[in-house]
Amino acid sequence: PALGSAIAPEDPFFTIVTYRGAFGNTNNWLNDWTALSDNNFLGDLVDPLTTADCTNPIRITDADLVAGETYTWTKDNCYVLDGLVFLEEGATLNIEAGTTIKGAFEVTTGDNTSALIVARGAQIFANGTADEPIIFTAELDDPTDPDDVPNPQEARGLWGGLIILGDATIARPGGEDGIEGIDADEPRARFGGTNDDDDSGVLRYVSIRHGGSALAPGDEINGLTLGGVGSG
């Protein structure tokens, strides 16, 4: 079904497929007869998704990313975020197309969920492609199997998500605030400032799945959270 893990109707009019939405990645029924096809609005077909083996992933904790350093995560590895992992001021994270990053199912750091937080002054460059998207998902998820988390109610909130914080103007007294879902005393979780041209990096062909941890009533981490991100 188009919305993902919904239960398929029993009506024989419908055909069960292995992809989400109206179009598969091996054929497109709009090709060669529609105006969209004639005017080259249809993208190229892509190969079936393949991901790195996550049997022995690289486990990333907050201590592994240091301010001012540059890091590169590659598609031949699988990365698991254990707890709240901050990319600190002055640090850069490059993520290769086709890379899979997962939020830990069992957090060992004492945090109540897993998330990647790009702090003010840090940059993330996640340049995926149509053939090789960058996938952020839960540790329990196999991105190549659309049916491994069959219950829609169980498919959300399996980890925190991706949080990007910038230095642009926000509508808060004093010009800054702390992002929801993280301890108010954590200085790296502050966002907002005076630089509307602030540049936090690039997200391109990035898929974020099964995120959105509910920490308490009215307090959660969304799959993707942007706070004070500038136009740079």
Description of each model-found segment:
Residues 1-232:
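Beta-strand/loop edge motif enriched in small/polar residues
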